[in-house]
Structure formats: structure tokens, C-alpha cells
Amino acid sequence: MDIEDEENMSSSSTDVKENRNLDNVSPKDGSTPGPGEGSQLSNGGGGGPGRKRPLEEGSNGHSKYRLKKRRKTPGPVLPKNALMQLNEIKPGLQYTLLSQTGPVHAPLFVMSVEVNGQVFEGSGPTKKKAKLHAAEKALRSFVQFPNASEAHLAMGRTLSVNTDFTSDQADFPDTLFNGFETPDKAEPPFYVGSNGDDSFSSSGDLSLSASPVPASLAQPPLPVLPPFPPPSGKNPVMILNELRPGLKYDFLSESGESHAKSFVMSVVVDGQFFEGSGRNKKLAKARAAQSALAAIFNLHLDQTPSRQPIPSEGLQLHLPQVLADAVSRLVLGKFGDLTDNFSSPHARRKVLAGVVMTTGTDVKDAKVISVSTGTKCINGEYMSDRGLALNDCHAEIISRRSLLRFLYTQLELYLNNKDDQKRSIFQKSERGGFRLKENVQFHLYISTSPCGDARIFSPHEPILEGSRSYTQAGVQWCNHGSLQPRPPGLLSDPSTSTFQGAGTTEPADRHPNRKARGQLRTKIESGEGTIPVRSNASIQTWDGVLQGERLLTMSCSDKIARWNVVGIQGSLLSIFVEPIYFSSIILGSLYHGDHLSRAMYQRISNIEDLPPLYTLNKPLLSGISNAEARQPGKAPNFSVNWTVGDSAIEVINATTGKDELGRASRLCKHALYCRWMRVHGKVPSHLLRSKITKPNVYHESKLAAKEYQAAKARLFTAFIKAGLGAWVEKPTEQDQFSLTP
């Protein structure tokens, strides 16, 4: 092989090898190495085999080599200001200096730019800033911003990415508002939300104003930026402070266990009072400011679709997030009061639930009706054939039974005398019986998603850091005051409606059509968790359970879905009152709109032929701003319950369904049947919604509620037709008891 061939073969490695400092391996005297040395140290240069590359003139005794470049660490993409954004939309614009005034040390420049035949002027202490202001005015001409002059100044004209101050983060994300994109064609904006049928997440371009965007401005569409670290920006407190300087934030309260504190801060803006809660005061201030920005300046935060509240189809008297946070705070605060600020041994819990009642539009008037804890069911050997044991001690089930006690109390209050009728939540119905007074609503709070279908597919809180949507520079302002087309079933409240930018990565339910979705599930006896129902397990027998068969109890998701059809009043109370439904279901953690809405009502949307006044209730579904921390450790074997009017909590052994002394609970079937019998003796027969003569046996009294039983039958049929399984009922012997000894 000749020298030329060897040079060609080694040329590919020359760039790398020539970066070496050969001075380290050369003789110190500069003499030429021998053949042996050259063969070992040859770098493929032109000196031939066994020879080093000769030093070049001017090298000062050193081999000539290129310094290795350091690889730059990629930093955050710098934000695009209005000038850059306008140049991308309309390249080649000419800016003209109109005037320069003021003293030498403080000049004022005025620049102008012509866009689509319209001239926009901007002023500033430098030509650059004057051009920037002119570009901003040009952008505003075709992107409609309410309160643009104030808010754009406060935003500092930074690129923004989607963030969520309702997340479970202690520190604020750097930026607040979503950017805008120029769509290919003008489309009216819509509200983005989520329901069980169709999960809407805007992954395409959105028009930002009701007026059509000129075709000349709509081309070319701006590309979606890939994920990148968010640039520095301003949090809600900073923005609100620039819009309304000098605001004072007040500390209202502190609640919660030591590992899951919740602070409440307030601020008054333009005479309006706003509250915010968070795991620290800083976060609580931010959420109070966020509420003010939404209400007064119409500035709304983005949320990933699965975390957005899903509004009710009925009367909605409150702003969803405000209501959710208030209900959560009230239930947690009451539980703290009942357990000596969480220091009592019975404050230990896995799940906390409660029912809150509102009687108007002001959540300040909300009242806690019941509070409960618990995660376990009765052991089959402790079943009672006299209705003296609680079968299901899960917190949300106990809270609903506590609510029944309150309803009986309110009925008795109405039946006492005319003066007490005004204080009762009930009034006579023109259709017979009683109904709730106008604007009386009940809200169910659960510290985590209910067991069963709602929880099984959303076992973790979403990681919001990886679930942001990125759009082009600019600020997106959502003018929800104007009438905009909106898909049915999505957000109807402007304060919670948000536009989603392209690229939202947190998925909704990726596999909504899988067979496992929506299946009826049963709880595990004396344990936690649920399993799907078996096709042949719809009937349980008393002797079979006593001989060792597992006692099956339907999951909380399934029971709440049942309440959304037959009502929360149950069969006995339905003889007196019209169906009562929860107006909202609020989760303290593990909220996922798609899974929760499916579990609560979407999976039985095929239900039909319901009796009069019965319906498929679709309550408000929402998480809370400050998601509750996970409760670690083993679940306690006890359940706690309290109803308004009680002096103290009642502690029940979930395994036996009775208290530690073996006494029956005030929530057991026997106790509630006693309350029903007492009310039945006071209600005139013409006010009964279902006629029943000489009630004696608990089971027969329940069957007398004909319309309720018909609605329940339609519900069970809907589950079967949807292929979700058959409802598993308890052994009938449990209900074959009377109050007479």
C-alpha cells in the first residue's frame, strides 16, 4: 500500500485525531522520532508511515490544532414579543420614525407602521420600544383583547404557556396565560370542557374573537412550538398588583392535619371579596388573585380538559371552583372541630366525606349537614336480620345516611306547627307530598374519587408539569361576555371556561370503549378495593353468606350512580317527598372528569321510561384547587359519623357494623325506620305520595314506594343493556324485620 492510499484511508479520522496536542508525545528536543515511535504514534498525516506530521511554520514549537468547541447547554427559548410576532404574521413591514421630542437625557420617539392599510403609532424612550408599542397596537387590531391596555401592560408582553394554579404545586409556574395562534380559517371560539361522551381538548387552532380574522392575517398558520422550559413571567398576585396597586391580602383561617394544611387568604378588589385556599399562604394569595382576575378582568387560566369542572345540567347557582373549594373547606373545618383539631385518635382516616347545604347564591351561607370517615364493609358473619348493623361504612355512604337523618328532622320540623314550617327546608308540593324549597341544594364532598369505576382508571394525580400546552407568543384573552357557540354539555359558566392551546398533552380517557370501562364492581368484604361483578352473582343468600361466601357490596361509584337516578332520599322517604338529587359532587383528590362523569351518569345514559319526577341527574363534577394529600398508612377499622344537631361524633366498628360496645348505630336501618314510622304517623294520608296502610315490615314499607321501585328497576335494566353487569343485592332476609318485638 503506498503513502497516498494510506492517506485516503485515514482521512475520515483526521478531524478528530488532529485535535490532539502532539507536543505531549514528541521528544522535548524537537528531534524526529524513530521509525518505531512513528509507527505507534502515526496520526495519518502526510509524513508517510512511521513518521509524525511535521510542525508548521509559525507554530512556535506546537502542533497546529483546532480547539474543541464546548457544547452549549440548551436554554429556554426566549419569548417572542409583539414585534417578532407581527413580523411572522406580516413579514416585511416598514417602521417609520415620525418624531423625536423631549430633552436629550429623556427623549420620546414616535414610530409608525402600516398594516392592511391602517397606520399604527407607538411611542417610547427608544426607537425599539416605540416600534414595539406600534406592533402591539397592530396586533390588537385583529386580536380582540378586553381591558387590553391595562392587562397587556401587566403581562409584560411575555410569551406564556398554559399553567394551572389549581394544581397541587407549592410553587407558582412562571407564566400564566395561553398564547394565541392564527388559524387557517376563521372559526368562532368554543368553550373547552369534558364530559363522559365526548372528551373535548382543543388540539387544533382556535379563533380568538367573534369577528372573522382577515384572510391576509390568517396566512400562514403559526407552527406549534415543541415543549420547552417556561420563560420567566408573572404570577396572579403580581399581575393583579399592577392592575390594582396597593391591594391588601388578609389571612382568614388555617385548617387541616399537620401534613396537609390548608390556608385561606382574601382580597377585596373594586368592592368585591375574593378568597383563595392553598397549602401555604403564598399559594392561597395566588388563588385569591386568580379569582379576582377572572371575575373583574375576565382573565382565565388554562386547565387540561380532564381537570376542568363539568357543570350540572340543572340549576347552577354558584361558580364551580368557588363552590368546590368552599365545600371542601367547610367539611374539613368541621371535621377538625369534631376531632379536637385533628388530635383525637378518631381523626385518623383514609377517606373523609361530607354533605353541605346551600340555600342561595352566596356560598358564605353554606352549612355542613354531615361529616363521615371510613373505607370498609361489614364482615358477613355480623349481618343483622333486625337492621341493627351497618353494612357499608365507606365515608360517602355514611354521609348520605347521615343526610337522611337531617331530612327526617326537617320533615318533623315542618309538621310541628306553622311557625316551624318557615324554618324547614321543605314545602308542600302541588303534586302531593313535599318538596325542597327553591334554591335548596345539597353538595357531596369526598376526599378522593369514589371506589369502583370512578377510581380504578384514575389512581394518580395528573402530573401537570408534563401536561402543558404550548402556543405561539402573545396573550390570549377570553371574552366570554359575548355569545359564542358552545357544544352541549360543556362549560356554561364563564368564570371556569378556558381556551385550550394546541398541544395539550395530558390525555383524556385514551381507551373509552374498552369493555372494562363502566363495569359494575363490588367491594371486598373486610378489605379495600373492588372487583367486577360476576354475571351469575346478582342474588346473595343469607345461609350462603353465613357459611362462608363473601358478602358482596356494590361500589361507591355504582351507588352514587344509583342516587343520580332514584334520588338520595331512598325508598322510604320517597313516600313523603319528591326525588332529591345532589347538585354537585366534589372530589378532594384523584379528580378526572372523563372517568368521574362516566361513572356517575354517562354509562347509563341509555336509561328510559323513568317515572314522573325521576330523571338521570347530572350534577356539577369538580375537583378542588388545593388537592388533598394522600393519606398514607393502613386504613383504620372504624368509621366516624356526625349529623348537624349531634353533640359529638359516633364511632362505629366497620367490621361489625356497630359501636365498640355492640350497640346499634343511629344510622342503621332499624333507627331510620323508627324515624320514618314517626313521620308517617304525623303526615295526613292525602299528603302521601304513595298510599300505604298499616306499615309494619321494613321490606313491605319500601315496596310501597311504587315509583321509586319502578325507577330502580329501570336503572338495573340500563346497566344490563349496556353490558355493565347485574346489580348485586343483599340477602332479602336483612329487610324482613318489624319494629314490634
Curated annotation (Swiss-Prot):
Q: What class of enzyme is it?
A: hydrolase
Going by the UniProt record, its keywords in alphabetical order are: Antiviral defense, Disease variant, Hydrolase, Immunity, Innate immunity, Intellectual disability, Metal-binding, mRNA processing, Nucleus, Phosphoprotein, Repeat, RNA-binding, Zinc
Tissue occurrence: Highly expressed in brain and heart and at lower levels in placenta. Fair expression in lung, liver and kidney. Detected in brain, heart, kidney, lung and liver (at protein level).
Q: Which InterPro entries match?
A: A_deamin, ADAR2_DSRM_1, ADAR2_DSRM_2, dsRBD_dom, IL1/FGF
The record lists 1D-myo-inositol hexakisphosphate as bound by: 400-401, 559, 562, 669, 702, 712, 730
Q: What is the effect of changing residue 722 to V?
A: In NEDHYMS; uncertain significance; mild decreased editing activity
Localisation: Nucleus; Nucleus, Nucleolus
Q: Which organism is it from?
A: Homo sapiens (Human)
Protein name in the entry: Double-stranded RNA-specific editase 1
Cofactor-binding details, from the entry: Binds 1 myo-inositol hexakisphosphate (IP6) per subunit.
Q: Which reaction does it catalyse?
A: adenosine in double-stranded RNA + H2O + H(+) = inosine in double-stranded RNA + NH4(+)
GO CC entries: cytoplasm; cytosol; nucleolus; nucleoplasm; nucleus; synapse
Q: Which residues are responsible for catalysis? A: 396 (proton donor)
